Amino acid sequence: MSSKEQKTPEGQAPEEIIMDQHEEIEAVEPEASAEQVDPRDEKVANLEAQLAEAQTRERDGILRVKAEMENLRRRTELDIEKAHKFALEKFINELLPVIDSLDRALEVADKANPDMSAMVEGIELTLKSMLDVVRKFGVEVIAETNVPLDPNVHQAIAMVESDDVAPGNVLGIMQKGYTLNGRTIRAAMVTVAKAKA
């Protein structure tokens, strides 16, 4: 046989065989390079993961700080609102004994005596004016009778048997109570009805 007449599988020409073998070699080379990972690529991937983690921590930190600032702002607003709302509490507490004295003066005044009528009227007007002024600032009087005893606004002094008032209800007021913008600043001292034995 001549050198040109070599046996080829399935009638392929020698150039085709060389090309096929060359393609197989090229196909094998990428597999070999895939096994050899460039250390720089691994380092880049590691750094990217660290960067993503740091960004997530930073975002979480920023959100946490924003939430804390918002909570602080709300608390401050509430504190300021309460300070405005209840700033008068100390002043009102100092004023309550004066109001009580005017109430007691009216209770003991001889209203049937014509000589005392001008004084009684003056005390009534003074008390009314004073109560009108404190009401403008959110003060309300607790002086209702025949209502259920409420420990938030009533202080029970005694229990008295009664047919007219249901047991557990306020029978009488010994000393009026007061609230400032819904908060009790002095509980009303009351007698409470109980069933007859």
Curated annotation (Swiss-Prot):
Keyword Cytoplasm part of the UniProt annotation: yes
Induction: By the sigma(32) subunit of RNA polymerase.
GO biological process: chaperone cofactor-dependent protein refolding; protein unfolding; protein-containing complex assembly; response to heat
Mutagenesis or variant effect for residue 157 to A: No effect in ability to interact with DnaK
Effect of residue 82 to A: Great decrease in ability to interact with DnaK
Gene Ontology CC: cytoplasm; cytosol; protein-containing complex
GO terms assigned for molecular function: adenyl-nucleotide exchange factor activity; protein domain specific binding; protein homodimerization activity; protein-folding chaperone binding; unfolded protein binding
CDD domains assigned: GrpE
Site (Interaction with DnaK): 183
Impact after mutating residue 149 to A: No effect in ability to interact with DnaK
Keyword match Cytoplasm: yes
Main subcellular location: cytoplasm
Effect annotated for changing residue 151 to A: No effect in ability to interact with DnaK
UniProt subcellular location: Cytoplasm
Outcome following mutation: residue 107 to A: No effect in ability to interact with DnaK
Record keywords, A-Z: Chaperone, Cytoplasm, Stress response
Record's subunit section: Homodimer.
Family: Belongs to the GrpE family.
Protein task: Participates actively in the response to hyperosmotic and heat shock by preventing the aggregation of stress-denatured proteins, in association with DnaK and GrpE. It is the nucleotide exchange factor for DnaK and may function as a thermosensor. Unfolded proteins bind initially to DnaJ; upon interaction with the DnaJ-bound protein, DnaK hydrolyzes its bound ATP, resulting in the formation of a stable complex. GrpE releases ADP from DnaK; ATP binding to DnaK triggers the release of the substrate protein, thus completing the reaction cycle.
Protein name: Protein GrpE
